[in-house]
Structure formats: C-alpha cells, structure tokens
C-alpha cells in the first residue's frame, strides 16, 4: 500500500474509531451493535493496510466492548489477538486488559503474570480506575518492591 493510501486508511480508521466511541456513549444495545460493526470494519481496513498500532487499538476496543458486557472469553480472545501484533508485547495496557480477563475467567496465575507485566510497564497508575480490585489481587501474588507499593 502506498504512503497516500496509508494516510487515507489511517484517516478512515480514525473516523471509525470516533464513530464507535460515539455509539458506545449511547449506552444502548443499538449503540453497542453499531460500535461492534464499526470496529470490525475499521479492523479489516487496518489489517489490509498493515497498520499495527491501529490494529492493536481496535482489537482492544473490541475486547473492551465484550468485557463491558461480561463476555470475558470473547474479550480475552480479542486481547490475545492484540498482544500478538507487532509492538503490542511492550504495551502495558494490553497486558492489563489480558490480566483483567484472566482474573474474571479464574485463570489466576495467568492474571497475576499479565497484571505484573502491566505494573512493571506503567506503574501503579494503570490500576487507577478499577476500584483497586486488580491491584489488590496482584499484591497477594508479588513480593512488595524495595521502595514499597
């Protein structure tokens, strides 16, 4: 794909991401269905254009959509797809998402591993919006760092 086509694909994907976010803010079944379709369409474009960062974002958005409806197996699958994309292995947010889904699927050893990777990559701040559940769980599985939590 040429540079111009890549830029066009990126612009279309950015519009799709914005549309999906807007649909999700409706917090209705219709909004969820619309967001799902929009994300899948954008993901197809990102895959065709071989845009790894956009693929990671879209797989995570898809996983977040499933996670929000407690479809943890399907969310886990989307996050697993994300982590296998070039560059994602270094992304603590993807590890955090995998850790959360593994926690809810009761794969606790794997949850601890993924949450530890998230913690090492982003620090305690990555747990700021989860009510403490995942960080408290992680603290039961790791020794405290030398300077404390």
Where are these regions (language model features)?
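Flexible helix-coil transition and linker loops at the boundaries of alpha-helical arrays
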Residues: 2-6, 43-52, 83-88, 125
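TPR repeat positional signature
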Residues: 12, 16-19, 59, 95
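Structural signature of alpha-solenoid helical repeat junctions
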Residues: 12, 31, 50-54, 74, ...
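Structural motif corresponding to the intra-repeat A-B loop/turn of tetratricopeptide repeats
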Residues: 26-29, 69, 105
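TPR/TPR-like (Sel1-like) alpha-helical repeat modules
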Residues: 103-126
């Amino acid at each position: 794909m040429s540079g111009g086509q890549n830029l066009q694909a990126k612009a279309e994907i950015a519009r799709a991401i914005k549309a999906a976010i807007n649909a999700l803010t409706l917090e209705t079944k219709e909004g969820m269905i619309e967001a799902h379709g929009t994300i899948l369409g954008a993901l197809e474009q990102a895959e065709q254009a071989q845009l790894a960062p956009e693929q990671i974002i879209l797989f995570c958005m898809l996983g977040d959509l499933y996670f929000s409806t407690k479809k943890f197996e399907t969310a886990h699958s989307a996050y697993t797809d994300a982590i296998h994309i070039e560059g994602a292995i270094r992304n603590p947010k993807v590890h955090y998402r995998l850790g959360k889904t593994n926690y809810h699927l009761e794969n606790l050893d794997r949850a601890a591993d993924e949450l530890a990777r998230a913690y090492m990559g982003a620090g305690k701040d990555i747990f700021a919006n989860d009510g403490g559940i995942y960080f408290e769980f992680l603290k039961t599985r790791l020794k405290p760092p030398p300077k404390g939590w």
